[in-house]
């Protein structure tokens, strides 16, 4: 059965490594829904978290194929449990004198940060799991969403293991 899965890839941070990884997914016909990438605490290494749909067989195949890429040192399919997943969202919403305080109050309930205030809009930063972000988007849609920008999901295993 196809479900959404999160894949961790650790690779040497060499020129073109992200392009080579994404090219493999493209050539094999795997659709990457979301991607986030950055450096790790270990100098010279990059960390990618990809969100893909797939079943167990296709995930096993993806894992084997990615390991074949030179400079890839770790590939992990995150399990459903014992994993922390977060995404960052910036949301610009219409806000006038009448609605501004209501929007700020809702943002505070969701633990959002107000990054910009203008006469006709607010920009709010929110971090959380997908359900929290969806809930906030639903609340803000009543006021008129002007723009949304989201990162890909970042994920990390709970406990001491990677």
Task: Write out the residue ranges for each language-model feature.
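Long, contiguous binding/interaction regions
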Residues: 1-47, 51-162
């Amino acid at each position: 059965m196809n479900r959404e899965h999160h894949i961790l890839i650790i690779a040497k941070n060499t020129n073109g490594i992200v392009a080579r990884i994404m090219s493999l997914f493209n050539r094999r016909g795997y659709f990457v829904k979301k991607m986030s990438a950055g450096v790790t605490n270990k100098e010279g290494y990059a960390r990618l978290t990809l969100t893909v749909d797939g079943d167990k067989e296709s995930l096993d195949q993806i894992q084997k194929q990615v390991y074949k890429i030179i400079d890839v040192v770790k590939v992990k399919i995150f399990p459903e449990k014992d994993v922390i997943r977060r995404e960052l969202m910036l949301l610009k919403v219409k806000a006038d004198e009448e609605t501004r305080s209501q929007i700020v109050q809702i943002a505070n309930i969701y633990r959002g940060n107000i990054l910009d205030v203008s006469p006709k809009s607010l920009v709010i930063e929110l971090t959380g799991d997908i359900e929290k972000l969806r809930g906030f988007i639903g609340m803000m849609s009543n006021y008129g969403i002007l723009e949304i920008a989201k990162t890909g999901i970042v994920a990390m295993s709970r406990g001491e293991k990677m």
